[in-house]
């Protein structure tokens, strides 16, 4: 199902943005971020997130993010934002003229957990696929929108039947850049059930 961005709802809209039936453009505001406590010992919760609400417990969300990031920590990608202390984000985050961080942050009960891999700084777009199976989530990325590779499998303890999912972009430092999101689509869950070892009995 193709997603009409006009049906999505902002949590903290940025000062500059544009929404059409085909795409979303976000111009980030300086000093916007999502992070809770771990290592840095600060709580940042002011990044704009544009999301769709669903009670569907098995689905995949696909989007292409294009970004003109240029200052450390500039980032754009996908998110499942439940509240300040419980959320998931996956993005490309600018580091310097040589590398960016392709990574994900999972925050449960007010503590964030970041995992990343370095990619070339010349990359200016990325496809993301976010899949849900109940309270479990899988994030994948792709450079062509066809062949996806796993970034992370995680759990959100506070994910009820109804959740919100979508896109975000932010600039934690003194920066602003444009991120354009296209090809927003919700599909049947592409993350198939595990077919190996049987689950433990609860």
Q: For each predicted feature, which ranges?
A:
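Extracellular glycan-recognition regions
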Residues: 1-202
């Amino acid at each position: 199902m193709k997603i009409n961005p006009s049906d999505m709802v902002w949590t903290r809209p940025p000062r500059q943005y544009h929404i059409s039936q085909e795409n979303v453009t976000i111009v980030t505001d300086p000093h916007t971020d999502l992070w809770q406590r771990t290592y840095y010992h600060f709580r940042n919760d002011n990044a704009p997130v544009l999301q769709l609400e669903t009670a569907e417990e098995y689905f995949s969300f696909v989007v292409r993010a294009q970004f003109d990031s240029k200052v450390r920590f500039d980032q754009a990608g996908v998110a499942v934002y439940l509240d300040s202390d419980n959320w998931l984000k996956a993005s490309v985050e600018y580091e310097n003229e040589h590398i960016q961080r392709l990574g994900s942050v999972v925050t449960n009960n007010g503590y964030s957990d970041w995992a990343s891999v370095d990619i070339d700084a010349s990359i200016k777009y990325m496809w993301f696929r976010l899949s849900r199976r109940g309270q479990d989530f899988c994030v994948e990325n792709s450079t062509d929108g066809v062949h996806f590779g796993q970034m992370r499998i995680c759990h959100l303890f506070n994910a009820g039947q109804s959740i919100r999912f979508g896109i975000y972009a932010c600039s934690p430092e003194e920066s602003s850049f444009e991120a354009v999101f296209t090809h927003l689509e919700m599909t049947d869950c592409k993350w198939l059930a595990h077919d190996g070892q049987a689950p433990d009995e609860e």
